[in-house]
Amino acid sequence: MNHFLDIHKTDTAELRQMMDSAHAMKAARKGRPKGQLDEDQPLAGRMVALIFEKPSTRTRVSFDVGVRQMGGQTMVLSGKEMQLGHGETIADTARVLSRYVDLIMIRTFEEATLLEMAEHATVPVINGLTNRTHPCQIMADVMTYEEHRGPIAGRKVVWAGDGNNVCASFLHAAGQFGFDFTFTGPSTLDPEAEFVGYAREKGRRVSIERDPAKAVAGADLVVTDTWVSMHDPQSARERRHNQLRPYQVNEALMAQAKPDALFMHCLPAHRDDEATSAVMDGPHSVIFDEAENRLHAQKAIMRWCLGL
């Protein structure tokens, strides 16, 4: 039984195995209707719980479709239905769910909730997102880069904006997949030292550059994310916009990167805030391939968790 909790907690060779599996499964589905089952149906007879303490579109749809394509069934539970940690303990919830399902995916706020779920579950647990990390997204991003440009090892990845949970998982991936990483954004939104330190300990070049044009110079991949959350009050939104406006990914900034550089955004996006529509719909952008690859990467993760 394998939990998928964070990229840095997973063996490098096993990450490579998952990545190769994701590429192969995507290729095998070419030309198939989206509702048609995979030929081998590896999840036939299996039940997967999808827990959403934090709502999502891409995570819910991609996991649900992925399980169904592999022949399994899903049980989708919202935070309101679960009341995680209120009344029944997370530990007891994990033990009970383990009697009903073969695999648990949880998208939650606190990392502690994920870790407690994994500690007490007797079935594999997948991190669908926490406030600290988002490993499933980065597996899809690495897959997308490989699909378009080949190996990501030795490449320069630049993150522009807020050093958030997706940025943190990119730093984990830098250490595991062997690429260099530059963060450009205001000092108040730097990624946590723990994540930067991990990538550096693994021998990767990690730099922080306040000038976005200097940061993006020679980049192979430029990535950004939303500046605000749906839960942020208006005052916080205005403050964030003022802080981050210099780090918008626009055509002038992308022109500083390599001519064949890619642009990614995990979506949903606030168009013309963190990135302009000209970039999002332009020749560097692979955002919709990136979104599709959540499906294939997560299918590979589920197979690995179950030893299939």
Swiss-Prot record:
Pathway: Amino-acid biosynthesis; L-arginine biosynthesis; L-arginine from L-ornithine and carbamoyl phosphate: step 1/3
Pfam families (alphabetical): OTCace, OTCace_N
PANTHER family linked: ORNITHINE CARBAMOYLTRANSFERASE, MITOCHONDRIAL (PTHR45753), ORNITHINE TRANSCARBAMYLASE, MITOCHONDRIAL (PTHR45753:SF3)
Manganese is among the record's keywords: no
Gene3D superfamilies in the record: Aspartate/ornithine carbamoyltransferase (3.40.50.1370)
Binding site for L-ornithine: 165, 225, 229-230
Localisation: Cytoplasm
Main function: Reversibly catalyzes the transfer of the carbamoyl group from carbamoyl phosphate (CP) to the N(epsilon) atom of ornithine (ORN) to produce L-citrulline.
Taxon lineage: Bacteria, Pseudomonadati, Pseudomonadota, Alphaproteobacteria, Rhodobacterales
Family to which the UniProt record says this protein belongs: Belongs to the aspartate/ornithine carbamoyltransferase superfamily. OTCase family.
Superkingdom of origin organism: Bacteria
InterPro entries: Asp/Orn_carbamoyltranf_P-bd (IPR006132), Asp/Orn_carbamoylTrfase (IPR006130), Asp/Orn_carbamoylTrfase_sf (IPR036901), Asp_carbamoyltransf_Asp/Orn-bd (IPR006131), Orn/put_carbamltrans (IPR002292), OTCase_ArgI (IPR024904)
One GO cellular component term: cytoplasm
Presence of the UniProt keyword Lipid metabolism in the record: no
Swiss-Prot/TrEMBL catalytic activity: carbamoyl phosphate + L-ornithine = L-citrulline + phosphate + H(+)
GO molecular function, one term: amino acid binding
Binding residue positions for carbamoyl phosphate: 56-59, 83, 107, 134-137, 266-267, 294
Enzyme Commission number, as recorded: 2.1.3.3
Biological process according to GO: arginine biosynthetic process via ornithine; citrulline biosynthetic process; L-arginine biosynthetic process
Keyword terms of this UniProt record: Amino-acid biosynthesis, Arginine biosynthesis, Cytoplasm, Transferase
Name of the protein described by the UniProt record: Ornithine carbamoyltransferase
